[in-house]
Amino acid sequence: MDILTIGEVLIDLTQTGKDARGIPQFAANPGGAPANLAVAASRLGAQTAFIGKVGADAFGRYLKEVLAENKVDVSGMAVDADHPTTMAVVSVDATGERDFSFYRSANADVMLCKEDISDEALKAAKIVHFGSVSLTADPSRTATLDAAARAKKLGATITYDPNYRANLWKNKEDAIAQMKAPLPLVDILKVSDEELPLLTGTTDCESGTAQLAQNGIRLIFVTLGANGVFYRFGEKTGHVAGVPCKVGDTNGAGDTFFGAALSKLCKEELDTLTVDKLEGILAFANKAASITTSRHGAIPAMPTLAEVEG
């Protein structure tokens, strides 16, 4: 297995427009950052698996089907009979930027337990990936951190996306503390230009990533929206330009970027990776993200390998 992702899969109720009376219209799309990444990487040629928890309901069954249809191994997905599948309402403004409202108190994804994540699954993966949404509450917080620590000991490369959603946390201070907690376990980190100052206190990519690298993180990406990506690879830093596109909806763009990058990095060794090779991978990831951004929804918008290479 190339990439195992752990965390939330949920229903994104994504605004698609308004009717003649001005009432917003919504589509029920599959979402959740770790699930998004698993699909993005799978469509681009990687073998991926997802571990998370859904409710014993129609949405839960639908999400499992969508992941399986996209060749994501869902044998590790758990079903919770007592808690419903999580939903988020995603409103999109005229520029394509998103606003999230989560319906998530005591929902299935938060109920992921240590026992739901086997050593066998962790041992089989080259890369084990997670985000911070599963760190917002227990038992999923303890389960996710425990899995990352176990995977690290078993030799996996650990990747992490803080993926800050303000309305999922008690307050900003708690969010920052919990988002920082896994950093010493992480080999490859992706943050947005909005998350960098939360974690480091600075908007400067050079000094911010230098600070993050003190945790032992070997490769750091700072996504800059339409402006591409800044990277720190050991002592080397650089920038790879974005790919211009007409914005439809930015939902899933960051997950597509990271999934695309990891679909290539899972075939490389960080010890022997060159800067030229890395920049080629990031150009590929930027193109994949631009295609997603030009469409609507997260998983439905993600490109195939032929579309990115074409």
Feature names for model-found ranges:
Residues 1-73:
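Glycine-rich phosphate/adenosyl-contacting loop at the front of the ribokinase-like
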Residues 2, 157, 188, 218-219:
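Proline-centered loop/turn at the N-terminus of a beta-strand
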Residues 3-4, 149-150, 201-310:
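Conserved phosphate-binding/catalytic region of the ribokinase-like
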Residues 39, 87-91, 228-231:
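Short beta-strand scaffold segments in enzyme catalytic cores
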Residues 47-130, 310:
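Conserved N-terminal subdomain of the carbohydrate kinase-like
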Residues 133-210, 228:
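Conserved beta-alpha-beta core of the PfkB/ribokinase-like small-molecule kinase fold
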